[in-house]
Amino acid sequence: MSDVTIVKEDWVQKRGEYIKNWRPRYFLLKTDGSFIGYKEKPQDVDLPYPLNNFSVAKCQLMKTERPKPNTFIIRCLQWTTVIERTFHVDTPEEREEWTEAIQAVADRLQRQEEERMNCSPTSQIDNIGEEEMDASTTHHKRKTMNDFDYLKLLGKGTFGKVILVREKASGKYYAMKILKKEVIIAKDEVAHTLTESRVLKNTRHPFLTSLKYSFQTKDRLCFVMEYVNGGELFFHLSRERVFSEDRTRFYGAEIVSALDYLHSGKIVYRDLKLENLMLDKDGHIKITDFGLCKEGITDAATMKTFCGTPEYLAPEVLEDNDYGRAVDWWGLGVVMYEMMCGRLPFYNQDHEKLFELILMEDIKFPRTLSSDAKSLLSGLLIKDPNKRLGGGPDDPKEIMRHSFFSGVNWQDVYDKKLVPPFKPQVTSETDTRYFDEEFTAQTITITPPEKDDDDGMDCMDNERRPHFPQFSYSASGRE
């Protein structure tokens, strides 16, 4: 966009997302909300296609004196995952200048969006959809914590937890993501979670987990998401050791289709790994969004703290260069390599050595791999995101055109017309044979956050929830 201008630019210290040390970065804040950091001050204002997807729109700003004085944090909810970036500058005045500039850009973008919503010819359609959704939650009693049995902790992190639940009324299984409200709303600030939950409601794709309900309690936001029962892809691969190239092509195509959809909505998934891929009862891929930033794990040898699964991290993430959509194509390369080769492309128990491999080591292939498969994986696992297959402006189209996928009809992929190469042996959506036996037989308890909640974690009156009016959603009205 030619009318995008730089609002503020300067050096700041940015804390690494995975290796928690501080690095100097030259940041540009632009009128479109982009906030991009470079290792060196860029000479050319018209920089090449920016890979960064981080925007200050709909974000929450916090100031803190820890772990260093004059620190500020930008936090936002992307899909249902909390993304957080931490910066520090030398003086309180500098911090004030940055936070005021960021807030001004965010406020202006918010106003523009509201104006667009009011003037847009589609706003009436949007409103009808919202009314339908409200109606669905009115006619079907609003969901509360009491409507579910809690079976197993699927994940736990800094901002909340994900629990496998069974809806009492239907017997269906879901993953419930529970986020603490205080991490999303600043004390004096209304969060933008509602807008984000609206994005979630509209995120519908055959290979992405869909949102079934969302509701709130006194101090938590709850997202109830689809949980398919064909088993984790990791489980099936570990049983068979490797998948054929045909089977890998089928799964790879479905993943590309889903990532294409997310990228078109300006969402970078960031967390593609085997553990986040499941199969539905028919054998199609479902990419889960149960991710939470894991508690930091400290590597004793270096005393640096890591966040996440280091084996899957792209080079640009490790180096803490700003990254964007190409990070997902690296993730695709890693999972497809695992499927066809039966191991990770880079692995070492020592994190420092692992990082060196990811950044420097050339990829090696088994002799059994076809030249098309080698070519695809080599392209996806290029260290430089700008040169990576899928890293250019064409994004997924580069991958779709690759010879490994020749003969694939991408519309048929989306329409689920391709026959899955493996069908899980489940008889229905509530068949639990691929679940761990230890947790299908028993339920777990959730500690009530407040003693005065009627049912432990029930919904509260709207008047007592000024920040989150109407944070309630049921997909049943749309199916």
Swiss-Prot record:
Keywords: Acetylation, ATP-binding, Cytoplasm, Disulfide bond, Glycoprotein, Kinase, Membrane, Nucleotide-binding, Nucleus, Phosphoprotein, Serine/threonine-protein kinase, Transferase, Ubl conjugation. Signal peptide: none annotated. The modification N-acetylserine is found at S2. AKT3 is one of 3 closely related serine/threonine-protein kinases (AKT1, AKT2 and AKT3) called the AKT kinase, and which regulate many processes including metabolism, proliferation, cell survival, growth and angiogenesis. This is mediated through serine and/or threonine phosphorylation of a range of downstream substrates. Over 100 substrate candidates have been reported so far, but for most of them, no isoform specificity has been reported. AKT3 is the least studied AKT isoform. It plays an important role in brain development and is crucial for the viability of malignant glioma cells. GO terms for biological process: brain morphogenesis; cellular response to insulin stimulus; homeostasis of number of cells within a tissue; intracellular signal transduction; mitochondrial genome maintenance; negative regulation of cellular senescence; negative regulation of PERK-mediated unfolded protein response; positive regulation of angiogenesis. Phosphorylation on Thr-305 and Ser-472 is required for full activity. Phosphorylation of the activation loop at Thr-305 by PDPK1/PDK1 is a prerequisite for full activation. Phosphorylation at Ser-472 by mTORC2 in response to growth factors plays a key role in AKT1 activation by facilitating subsequent phosphorylation of the activation loop by PDPK1/PDK1. Ubiquitinated. When fully phosphorylated and translocated into the nucleus, undergoes 'Lys-48'-polyubiquitination catalyzed by TTC3, leading to its degradation by the proteasome. The keyword Transmembrane does not apply. Residues 446-479 are annotated as: Disordered. It is a peripheral membrane protein. The modification Phosphoserine is found at S472. Binding of the PH domain to the phosphatidylinositol 3-kinase alpha (PI(3)K) results in its targeting to the plasma membrane. ATP binds at L154, G155, K156, G157, T158, F159, G160, K161, V162, K177. InterPro entries: AGC-kinase_C, Akt3, Kinase-like_dom_sf, PH-like_dom_sf, PH_domain, PH_PKB, Pkinase_C, Prot_kinase_dom. Residues 451-460 have a biased composition (Acidic residues). This is RAC-gamma serine/threonine-protein kinase. Residues 5-107 form the PH domain. It comes from Rattus norvegicus. Interacts (via PH domain) with TCL1A; this enhances AKT3 phosphorylation and activation. Interacts with TRAF6. Interacts with KCTD20. Interacts with BTBD10. Residues 148-405 form the Protein kinase domain. Its main location: nucleus. Glycans are attached at T302, T309, S472. The keyword Zinc does not apply. One of its GO terms (molecular function) is protein kinase C binding.
